């Protein structure tokens, strides 16, 4: 039986990535060209800067991925690409490169939802058992997704305002931490105590929606008022208190979802899934009857490896796109 190879491209935000997947589950290469250093001085991602960086490095990423995988273009069976959600300019660069490569090598094109990629990064750990629930937590999204079968996603809960990763970066900026702030806040939180009271929005309500804008505002107000009064705040305790509130909200809504949708598997994925505090709370708060699957740290952030793992499922369903495929920056899963 011939080996199957899928080349995947990811460029939805500030990472340019090209990966190659063998036989639906073995990642032979996952090249990531990060732009974090370029955006640090701005305190966040600048779309125009991101697009320019993608243009500069995407061709090299293709070459490096093929070389690392030890294959040539003629060995490939398909090309997959993120077509949304994300920054429209950034998406278009990756899509143009993927479509040109697919056309030149007469390969089918597989369209992949970026968030499906995050979710299916869990396939790197084990083959998933359906139905399952997923908590997707990143800089742009916070959502609970019910997955009835391979490639069948439905949103059952999501944030009404800020995404959890966005809240981390905004409070990090207030504290003068380096962008992206999530990892540093997590590290500082482990050295502090939950001594400042922050709100846990809608934590007792039965619905599965999240809200982090009130928590973010409460944090900013506390910090501002302390500055005005010349009061000293303990940075480690601030981080510990903020993170405790975030995790209380995430865990409460996830547990409610598990009661409403009695599944045996919970996937937790996205950039914030790298958070050590979140991983610790999942280990202590989620029933041992639930199989909690979290992608390895190397697949939590944006990368093409996760896009390839999601694309393998779409390949089986023969979900191919024409070369007229356009970017969908606001692409979302279907809601219930």
UniProtKB/Swiss-Prot annotation:
**Which is an annotated GO molecular function term of this record?**
N(6)-L-threonylcarbamoyladenine synthase activity
Q: What is its main location?
A: cytoplasm
Which Gene Ontology BP terms does the record give?
A: tRNA threonylcarbamoyladenosine modification
Quote the record's cofactor note. Answer: Binds 1 Fe(2+) ion per subunit.
Could you list this entry's UniProt keywords, alphabetically sorted: Acyltransferase, Cytoplasm, Iron, Metal-binding, Transferase, tRNA processing
| A Pfam family of this chain | TsaD
Give the enzyme's EC designation. Answer: 2.3.1.234
Q: Which residues bind Fe cation?
A: 114, 118, 302
Query: Entry's NCBIfam families?
Result: gcp_kae1, T6A_TsaD_YgjD
Q: Which gene encodes it?
A: tsaD
Listed name of the protein: tRNA N6-adenosine threonylcarbamoyltransferase
Localization, per the record, is: Cytoplasm
Q: Does the keyword Protein transport apply?
A: no
Q: Where does substrate bind?
A: 136-140, 169, 182, 186, 275
Which cofactor is recorded for it? Fe(2+)
């Amino acid at each position: 039986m011939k080996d199957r190879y899928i080349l995947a491209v990811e460029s939805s935000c500030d990472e340019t990535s090209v990966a190659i997947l063998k036989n639906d589950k073995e990642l032979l290469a996952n090249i990531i060209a990060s732009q974090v250093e370029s955006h640090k001085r701005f305190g966040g991602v600048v779309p125009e800067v991101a697009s320019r960086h993608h243009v500069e490095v995407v061709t090299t990423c293709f070459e490096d991925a093929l070389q690392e995988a030890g294959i040539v273009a003629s060995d490939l069976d398909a090309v997959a690409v993120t077509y949304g959600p994300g920054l429209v300019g950034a998406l278009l660069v990756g899509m143009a490169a993927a479509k040109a490569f697919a056309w030149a090598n007469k390969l089918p094109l597989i369209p992949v939802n970026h968030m499906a990629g995050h979710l299916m990064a869990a396939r790197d750990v084990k083959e998933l058992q359906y139905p399952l629930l997923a908590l997707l937590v990143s800089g742009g999204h916070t959502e609970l997704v019910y997955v009835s079968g391979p490639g069948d996603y439905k949103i059952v809960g999501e944030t009404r305002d800020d995404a959890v990763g966005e809240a981390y970066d905004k409070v990090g900026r207030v504290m003068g931490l380096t962008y992206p702030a999530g990892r540093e806040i997590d590290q500082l939180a482990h050295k502090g105590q939950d001594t400042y009271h922050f709100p846990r929005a809608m934590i007792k309500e039965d619905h599965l929606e999240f809200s982090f804008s009130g928590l973010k505002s409460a944090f900013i107000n506390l910090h501002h008022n302390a500055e005005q009064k010349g009061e000293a705040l303990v940075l480690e305790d601030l981080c510990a208190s903020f993170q405790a509130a975030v995790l209380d909200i995430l865990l409460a809504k996830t547990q409610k979802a598990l009661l409403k949708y009695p599944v045996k598997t919970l996937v937790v994925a996205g950039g914030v899934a790298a958070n050590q505090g979140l991983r610790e709370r999942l280990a202590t708060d989620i029933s041992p009857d639930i199989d909690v699957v979290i992608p390895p740290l190397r697949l939590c952030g944006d990368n093409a490896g996760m896009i390839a793992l999601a694309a393998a499922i779409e390949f089986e369903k023969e979900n191919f796109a024409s070369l007229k495929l356009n970017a969908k920056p606001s692409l979302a899963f279907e809601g219930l």
